[in-house]
Regions:
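Glycine-rich phosphate/dinucleotide-binding loop and adjoining beta-alpha-beta core of small-molecule
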Residues: 1-97
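Short, small-residue alpha-helix embedded
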Residues: 52, 104-135
């Protein structure tokens, strides 16, 4: 079962770990396990996953709610939305790039892939999450300028990332 697998990985992992989608859903019932994890963890929930983790996506202050959950879990939280919030519980970045085209299925997988790539280059988790969010949103903004934001697919993001890195 996925929940047991995620718990097992959390108990032995030493490298930075990104939990997204089903990984978040599997960890949610045992969220306090993250506090004792030996590796840095980055959670990348959308509002529904944030709710399952114990956050309130409709809170009056979304940033404070994200900080509260990051502090509780000892994880870096990248709360996806129209203004993505990245926090480790103490420091906060708010990403202002991106557009509704990012709601397309698979775009979160592109974000997770960029984040894992940055972590693999030994960039600190909070900074890697902030950089990945900016790159992701900026790639979507380029795609929207060139193609429109409706009908955007993950490949549209992937094709624009190299221009942002030059």
């Amino acid at each position: 079962e996925l929940t047991r697998l995620v718990q097992a990985v959390l108990s032995v992992c030493r490298a930075p770990l990104v939990l997204d989608a089903d990984g978040i859903n599997a960890a949610a019932p045992h969220i306090d396990v993250l506090r004792g994890c030996a590796c840095p963890v980055v959670l990348t929930p959308h509002d529904g996953e944030f709710l399952r983790l114990g956050g309130d996506p409709k809170a009056a202050d979304r940033t404070q709610e994200a900080m509260r959950l990051a502090d509780r879990t000892h994880a870096v939280l990248l709360l996806k939305g129209s203004r993505t919030v990245i926090t480790d519980g103490l420091n906060v970045y708010v990403n202002h790039t991106g557009n509704p085209g990012l709601a397309a299925g698979g775009s979160g997988d592109v974000l997770a892939g960029m984040l894992v790539s940055l972590l693999g280059q030994h960039i600190m988790p909070r900074e890697a999450a902030a950089a990945a969010a900016w790159l992701h949103g900026s790639a979507a903004d380029l795609a929207a300028q060139e193609l429109g934001e409706y009908g955007m697919v993950p490949e549209d993001l992937l094709l624009r990332i190299p221009r942002l890195l030059l």
